[in-house]
């Protein structure tokens, strides 16, 4: 396997392990999720540049749009929770309450 692909898969795996390990803090979870999205973006960009297919060239752009939307929603949620409760611990929050 090419070392570039191995490094990108390693970055995705480390971000996934960070997401599973630091799931009690919202900031850490959002950063790990962003790392996963960026490694997926780089991987799809490399695959799209190697295949030279016009249909797959739009995939990295779509993934980047989803990553930007995820970051915006996550940041808005973080600001809302920290303004309301004053902390970012996920296990202390029960967002299903009316």
UniProtKB/Swiss-Prot annotation:
EC assignment: 7.1.1.2
Cellular component, GO, one term: mitochondrial inner membrane
Transmembrane segments: 1-21, 27-47, 61-81
Keyword terms of this UniProt record: Electron transport, Membrane, Mitochondrion, Mitochondrion inner membrane, NAD, Respiratory chain, Translocase, Transmembrane, Transmembrane helix, Transport, Ubiquinone
Coiled coil stretches, renumbered: none
Compartments reported by the entry: Mitochondrion inner membrane
UniProt keyword NAD present: yes
Gene Ontology BP annotations: ATP synthesis coupled electron transport
One Pfam family, short name: Oxidored_q2
Effect recorded for residue 44 to A: In strain: Isolate 661nigra
Keyword hit for Transport: yes
Catalytic activity: a ubiquinone + NADH + 5 H(+)(in) = a ubiquinol + NAD(+) + 4 H(+)(out)
Top-level taxon of the source organism: Eukaryota
Single GO MF descriptor: NADH dehydrogenase (ubiquinone) activity
Membrane topology: Multi-pass membrane protein
Class of this enzyme: translocase
InterPro entries reported in the protein's UniProt record: NADH_UbQ_OxRdtase_chain4L/K, NUOK/Mnh_C1-like
Cysteine pairs bridged by disulfides in the record: none
Family to which this protein belongs: Belongs to the complex I subunit 4L family.
Function, in words: Core subunit of the mitochondrial membrane respiratory chain NADH dehydrogenase (Complex I) which catalyzes electron transfer from NADH through the respiratory chain, using ubiquinone as an electron acceptor. Part of the enzyme membrane arm which is embedded in the lipid bilayer and involved in proton translocation.
Quaternary structure (record): Core subunit of respiratory chain NADH dehydrogenase (Complex I) which is composed of 45 different subunits.
Protein name (record): NADH-ubiquinone oxidoreductase chain 4L
Organism: Macaca nigra (Celebes black macaque)
């Amino acid at each position: 396997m090419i070392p570039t692909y191995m490094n990108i898969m390693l970055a995705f795996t480390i971000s996934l392990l960070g997401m599973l390990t630091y799931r009690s803090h919202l900031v850490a979870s959002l950063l790990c999720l962003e790392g996963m999205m960026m490694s997926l973006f780089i991987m799809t960009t490399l695959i799209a540049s190697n295949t030279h297919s016009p249909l797959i060239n739009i995939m990295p752009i779509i993934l980047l749009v989803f990553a930007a939307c995820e970051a915006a929603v996550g940041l808005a949620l973080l600001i809302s929770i920290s303004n309301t409760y004053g902390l970012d611990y996920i296990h202390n929050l029960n967002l299903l309450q009316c």
